[in-house]
């Protein structure tokens, strides 16, 4: 089996998409391929078919290979709950909560498990494309590293180092990273990649020659800056407002926002513009307000209260349409109770009181794949998605459920999810990915179109669009990199 590891000079340099591109290229060339990232830190997660939780970046990479996402592609997921604490997910299940130092002391405990996962991949696939995290030059963390050079050494993988030229300082970041690596680690790096370049590559060539003289490894290519409709995992990317798009969707960007990949399918609609708001001054008059998921619902509810957005949301709810997803659904209720101090020690807190329901946090985390029917619709419809939450919500008789769940992790069930008020303009659901399918997305956007005097439209199938975008990404990267050299590095050609 062949393997290659993509590391970067920093976070957000484009490692995840370079890995996705290589996965698709190798697949196009006839090889069986699997992505692997030993440890991921993200608030964007996904639930596999067997009800386990993993990072979204490896989900996209799995799609690039044509595989169903599985937790062995991302055995450890860290979900920050505050600046210094995180929830640790191991093999898809909650391992516990820890401080940064506590986890640093734990890491070596997982080494054997990671090696075992990788050994199985070696037996099953022709090529494994690995991804590092942050930078391999974090010298204060090197002694217990299990995701960058520590992982590369564990499985004897060659490394390609990616730098982001769009931020500036790419030569210094690449040379500086190499400077801080140990001699054995430097030998493992077989090439550099310049990512997100805008302009004429000819202007860059003298710098590339000088860089090669300094670091003594070749630059394998320059990848142009390209806008693709593929999800971004590292942060709540600021969506570019479409000047020509008549449908304005505002999303509350809360401090602990999670699973904002729920917005990606909406972003693919040509006449829809999405913008994040963090203050009442930015609120304006959107056609739809979305309150997204949160890793700390209570603290984010307090944030809405403190910054004045609670007042704006309540005023908007008189005539505007609001959709809450997961944590955003919970804040719409009348009360949130936390008897086990899952999030804070407040015990309970009043919600926005826009839906007559209350949420009670429990110790056990719910992680399930679900299939649901949108209620009160004449058309045959199915919505697919997944749930990731720590609480259950109970609503009164005068609140109608939004969905009926009929399949949970592959088993037949029959229970209600979500709620919608009597007026029909405020609703919420626990289902992540609710907009990915055509049915619910098309229904909501067409309602907004009609309200603005616009014609209804058919929504495109998001999965088809994603496949086209992955092919486009692969074409760009194939044309930009020395693939013959990369195949030589992994011993395939």
Swiss-Prot record:
CDD domains: CobQ_N, GATase1_CobQ. PROSITE patterns: GATASE_COBBQ. Gene3D superfamilies: 3.40.50.880, P-loop containing nucleotide triphosphate hydrolases. Keywords: Cobalamin biosynthesis, Glutamine amidotransferase. GO terms for molecular function: ABC-type vitamin B12 transporter activity; catalytic activity. Residues 246-440 form the GATase cobBQ-type domain. One of its GO terms (biological process) is cobalamin biosynthetic process. Coiled coil: none annotated. It comes from the Bacteria. Pathway: Cofactor biosynthesis; adenosylcobalamin biosynthesis. The active site is at 326 (nucleophile), 432. Belongs to the CobB/CobQ family. CobQ subfamily. Catalyzes amidations at positions B, D, E, and G on adenosylcobyrinic A,C-diamide. NH(2) groups are provided by glutamine, and one molecule of ATP is hydrogenolyzed for each amidation. This is Cobyric acid synthase. It comes from Clostridium botulinum (strain Okra / Type B1).
